[in-house]
Amino acid sequence: MKTFPVSIVTPDGPVYEKEVEMVSVKAESGEMGILPGHIPTVAPLKISAVRLKNGGHTDYVAVSGGFIEVRPDKVTVLSSSAEEANHIDIHRANEAKRRAEQRLQDKQAHVDFKRAEMALQRAVNRLNVSDMK
């Protein structure tokens, strides 16, 4: 099957750069599956896992939202943070989840609930993706 290059990039640099047969992402508008030769598209992403298939192997990368740019010959994912499943520090992700849950339980006016909810979503996503390795 044909392949195409995929780059997942954060402000700190590239996280994933390989040739794949298919990319699956969760865009704000729904699930997207991208194969070689896909029409050009740009879409905002949800906090989720990016699935990258090549042959019988699937890689998973946790992304904290961002954008996907699809060109017929290349796919680029831009995200504020991204981690491959096998590089996720499970202890750190559990601690982030615990802290976010604690902030959400605090009924104090100074707590930014939207920010705490986003932190919880990112931590849960990282834990879910780490289970996919």
UniProtKB/Swiss-Prot annotation:
Localization recorded for this chain is: Cell membrane
Could you tell me which Pfam families the record lists for this protein? ATP-synt_DE, ATP-synt_DE_N
For this UniProt entry, the molecular function terms from Gene Ontology, in alphabetical order, are: ATP binding; proton-transporting ATP synthase activity, rotational mechanism
Binding partners and assembly: F-type ATPases have 2 components, CF(1) - the catalytic core - and CF(0) - the membrane proton channel. CF(1) has five subunits: alpha(3), beta(3), gamma(1), delta(1), epsilon(1). CF(0) has three main subunits: a, b and c.
List the NCBIfam families hit by this protein, alphabetically: ATP_synt_epsi, PRK00571.1-3, PRK13446.1
UniProt xrefs under HAMAP family: ATP_synth_epsil_bac (MF_00530)
Protein name as catalogued: ATP synthase epsilon chain
